[in-house]
């Protein structure tokens, strides 16, 4: 297997990165572990950030999918001990569409926002019941439809404060129950009931659970009646007569369609309990607030029991109408699931007028409930469509998760291949803040994280660091890389050499000698292995040997003709970059190139041919003069 360019970093907090490396950042396949092997990301990296891979947390939970800028973004699958989410991710949180499933059978498919159900969605409960409608911040809120399963299949509710199966993955801790009020036994109509069944008739368990203690048994109501009898000193009626009159008023209210009696009229006569058939189902359509039936809505049971009107906290509360299976009705104002009539009657208005006002309010409530049903049915259709889209996203996320697992496998294989080659970390010089002195810097210092910190277990990141003031040398675009066998950088022009390497005196003469040798066809020393001395360049960041901190071999030195001492031409510098920079950990080969200084042109050495010609001309002139004289 071809092993690509890679790096290994051991962090101070115990984390470690082994994998691909490019341009000073993690790139390609790599594995990063947290402190003490608490959490691991393995997969693909792109310019210092995770792109596609698998993150495994210390508790065993995992995420498989896409990443962007160090956060979960795109499609992915998250698995924990008791639930799984498959779908889209946005900014590291669940959203916008996905499917959440629990080992108990609870499932939600729909829209998400900031990690919670928000928008339209369908929730299927462990017993098979469903809710389709609107959501807000992880709770049922808006318009929706709750459909139960047959009564004998419905899940038995454990908590009397919750009357339907809620989203166990999004519910906050349940606050303590409020103190019971006089006349309220402290239980909701679904206390001990089954999921989806909240409608209570006169003979249901709710009617039986709302019985008060009779005056004969003593208690609050007996004391209140005694005190009221003492206060009403002008009336010469006995306690027994009061008790009898109260019973007569309550007995006349049961089964009536008008508003007789008052709220404080005493305990109702318990009706014989009527068992719910095992095949009975119940459906509620209407408004929801904070995960409970609140507002206008209609609840109907398959045996004919029906309520239309106002709701509050999963109870009939406000004005509404109840229709019994036998066709009889009761209507009026409800409070905590019981029919009341606004306190003791003190006015002298005719009974028909008072009934007419209550009837008008009931009709308005029924009309509002029916409008709410229509709106809830529309939201139900939208929620079903969004759930179908979420299922498609879940399938796509599962496919991406498979690719992420394969990328993680490749990353671990490459890390295993790189591990033996990167066992011995090198040491490189690092300039301090003053830029004058150097100190050894271990190769295993962090090069991809800021301040030597590894990412948290939730989301491992390789953030982009600010650019370092010591940047690695890069070849100009016009130059081509060296062929195999050469690893030297280009030499600077003689005019650019600093003053301390030679001035216009002795060093200038030596330079003139070099130029004379070139004109005469003499060849200077070339680089080893037959590679050209000038024009080529090699990026030291592409060499594993240099990254591991091996020493550079010395370059050959040029000598002046006839001279015994060599003069330095140029020296490669291993530049150690700041560990806080994005290119930290890269050993780069740089050459000192100070500003060029212009030198006066020096006359070249005398040409032997010219000297010979001049000498011959002198001899010829001398011969001619001698002939003339003779």
Swiss-Prot record:
Q: Which GO terms describe its biological process?
A: learning; neuromuscular process controlling balance; regulation of cytokine production; regulation of store-operated calcium entry; regulation of synaptic plasticity
Gene label = Jph4
Could you tell me which SUPFAM superfamilies the record lists for this protein? Histone H3 K4-specific methyltransferase SET7/9 N-terminal domain
Which stretches of this protein does UniProt put in the Cytoplasmic compartment? Answer: 1-608
Q: Where in the cell is it found?
A: Cell membrane; Endoplasmic reticulum membrane
Which top-level group of life is the source organism from? Eukaryota
A Pfam family per the record: MORN
Q: Which residues cross the membrane?
A: 609-629
Q: Which family does it belong to?
A: Belongs to the junctophilin family.
Name the UniProt record assigns to this protein: Junctophilin-4
Residues in MORN repeats: 17-39, 41-62, 63-84, 85-107, 108-130, 131-153, 284-306, 307-329
